[in-house]
Amino acid sequence: MENSRRDMMAGACAATAMTFAPAALAAWEPSQRYPDPAVQSLDPSFNKYRLALAGVERLATGCRFNEGAVYFGDARCLLWSDIPNNRIMRWDEETGRISIFRQPSNHANGITRDRQGRLITCEHSGRRLTRTEYDGAITVLIDRFEGKRLNGTNDVVVTRSAGS
């Protein structure tokens, strides 16, 4: 039997995965030293913002591409987007428990809070910017500009309006 290029590539990928998988799946342990030597600044000008006694903690596994984290101090939880898995995740600060806040999320990306504390979400597949009301209802804030659908809403920041 003759091996095809596809067979060779599949074998190479499998060998690579077997080589690096143990390191990727190894138990993660937080640093016992401060400042955490695993946290490195690529730009020295950032060092003035680094907290010497702050470390890195793993909150969750099973996510594929996380983005848009926003902290809700009043609810003591952290929300973030897991874009490829089409969900918004929630970490409860009091229990340490991870749960799904919303799925599907329309491939939510950037998220933040408005000045009233509601969740504002950029939705890739919805091609829109939405607000989650206190009762859980979703309000579309914008999905078109000059009559055309938005394309790839990404990150969002809420600022004060003029005069407020």
Model regions and ranges:
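Sequence-structural signature of mature extracellular/luminal beta-sheet repeat domains
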Residues: 2-3, 9-13, 25-164
